[in-house]
């Protein structure tokens, strides 16, 4: 099931790629059903907050009519930044599944261990490496084309 949901997140990343946004996608899952999805839309929305994970969390919160997404998991093609990691914790998401590490901005294991901090009022568990090569490939090809 993890691969299936990460494939859905990759679809969102491909949409971002086609729109010339950084190709990161995310889906929020509850009871094996996608209740929220998103891709980076920072350029489209002129908003630093329009990251894939936050877009997916916002959609799921609207559907659930609750910002607390207890019993939910989130799948992100790339390791979340601090902004998204805080949103994941604040929304009480149970599990974070990551496609590939982000060596420059990743706040889960690459640049920080944000989810392991003791000051959080909620513990989100994480796993890295779901469809890692596919997730790496899309973001690397995007930035290669930009250079």
Question: What does each model-identified segment do?
Answer:
Residues 42, 76, 100:
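Residues that line or immediately flank small-molecule/substrate-binding pockets and catalytic motifs
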Residues 1-19, 67, 80-147:
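Zinc-dependent deaminase
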Residues 24-32:
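Short beta-strand scaffold segments in enzyme catalytic cores
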Residues 9, 13-16, 26, 52, ...:
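Small-residue (primarily alanine) positions within well-ordered alpha-helices
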Residues 20-24, 70:
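Short, basic and Ser/Thr-rich N-terminal targeting/leader segments
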Residues 49-50, 54, 58-87:
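Helix-adjacent hinge/juxtasegments
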Residues 44-47:
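Conserved Nudix-box catalytic region and its N-terminal flanking loop in Nudix hydrolases
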Residues 35-42, 125:
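Short beta->alpha transition motifs characteristic of CBS
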């Amino acid at each position: 099931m993890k691969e299936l949901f990460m494939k859905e997140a990759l679809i969102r990343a491909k949409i971002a790629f086609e729109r010339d946004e950084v190709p990161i996608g995310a889906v929020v899952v509850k009871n094996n059903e996608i209740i929220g999805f998103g891709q980076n839309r920072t350029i489209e929305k002129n908003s630093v907050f329009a990251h894939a994970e936050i877009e997916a969390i916002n959609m799921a919160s609207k559907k659930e009519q609750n910002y607390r997404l207890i019993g939910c998991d989130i799948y992100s093609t790339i390791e979340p930044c601090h902004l998204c990691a805080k949103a994941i914790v604040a929304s009480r998401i149970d599990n974070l599944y990551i496609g590939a590490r982000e060596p420059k901005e990743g706040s889960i294991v690459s640049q920080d261990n944000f989810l392991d901090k003791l000051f959080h009022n909620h513990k989100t568990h994480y796993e890295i490496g779901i469809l890692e090569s596919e997730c790496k490939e899309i973001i690397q090809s995007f930035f290669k084309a930009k250079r």
